[in-house]
Amino acid sequence: MATGFFWDEHCFWHAGGNYAFLLHVGGLVQPLAAGGLPESPETKRRLKNLMDVTGLTAELAAQSAPPATRQMLQRVHPASYLDAFKSVSDAGGGEIGHHAPFAHGGYEIAALSAGLAVAAVDAVAMGQLDNAYALSRPPGHHCT
């Protein structure tokens, strides 16, 4: 068997806004590089690029996965949370919790991120892979 590597370029497109660490930019708060959030696409993109140039990606079962379905998401999140997230996402973005900013399309990217993790776990649980890693973002650690 093999090691799975689940990733999708679209996950790198998640945009959290312009921050200086956890502070909104403006007034006396100056923006930092890469949008100013500790979690940024650049660290993930660099990892993927290094995997590619060293040949590691070619040795893995690299693949994408479909987004998590609404039914999958509702196993973890209440429908009201998902409805609010989708509504704010469609309206151009905002925050859906404490320090959980996202831009337009953030709901779809978050569903894709969750789908990558679900697919990785499923492939290992079904014996299709020995182990797997999902390089996904947003990480989802602020979801309620």
Give the role of each language-model region:
Residues 1-144:
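HDAC/HDAC-like amidohydrolase catalytic core signature
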